[in-house]
Amino acid sequence: MRIGILGGTFDPIHYGHIRPAIEVKEALGLDKVLLMPNHIPPHKHQPNLSTAQRLKMVADVCAELAGFELCDIEANRDTPSYTVVTLEQLSTQYPNAELFFIMGMDSFIHLQSWHKWQQIFGFANLVLCQRPGWHLSNEHPMQQVLMARSAAIDTLKNPPQKHHPIHGRIFTVDITPQDISSTQIRSALAIGKIPTDALMPVTLNYIQKQQLYLS
């Protein structure tokens, strides 16, 4: 089994998260994608909504998307949501699965600042979402990591080895640009605008019913 993992504050979850995840799932032939809300994000400010509210929104989205599941492993932890700790737990939970941690290129270029970042490759593969035509400069310190671990998507045509899951590779997927951010959505909602083009109906319905993000 091949499992994608997309973490985030999801405050709120929107098409800028969902559409790239769908494109990655299709491009790599993943069996499922876990959407994983952070509880205590180590690289961001605390979310506006409670963990329970964000879990509810993500659960509602997963209920409408085939092959997507809510992962609450970080939400149930009262310590910072370090990726390496999470992936170690997931590799134990899914011992025969190949894990694919999905991240934007904007996060990858700062990977060296993450807690025990080099150990991440011992538990999972990375999937980098990038805009078509964008490339990391040769001078960037992460370029050597990318070159050393880069793998072609075609190598995934062969089924995974059940008892010998492969990790440590980096796959790059060109995704459709999404000019959407949670900050923009929160700002719009605060002044009474309804961003129907940015949110799934089930998410918007929950936000309106609970009167969230009102200033």
From Swiss-Prot:
Keywords: ATP-binding, NAD, Nucleotide-binding, Nucleotidyltransferase, Pyridine nucleotide biosynthesis, Transferase. It catalyses: nicotinate beta-D-ribonucleotide + ATP + H(+) = deamido-NAD(+) + diphosphate. One of its GO terms (biological process) is NAD biosynthetic process. Signal peptide: none annotated. Its EC number is 2.7.7.18. Pathway: Cofactor biosynthesis; NAD(+) biosynthesis; deamido-NAD(+) from nicotinate D-ribonucleotide: step 1/1. The keyword DNA-binding does not apply. GO terms for molecular function: ATP binding; nicotinate-nucleotide adenylyltransferase activity. Catalyzes the reversible adenylation of nicotinate mononucleotide (NaMN) to nicotinic acid adenine dinucleotide (NaAD). Belongs to the NadD family. This is Probable nicotinate-nucleotide adenylyltransferase. It comes from Shewanella putrefaciens (strain CN-32 / ATCC BAA-453). The gene is nadD.
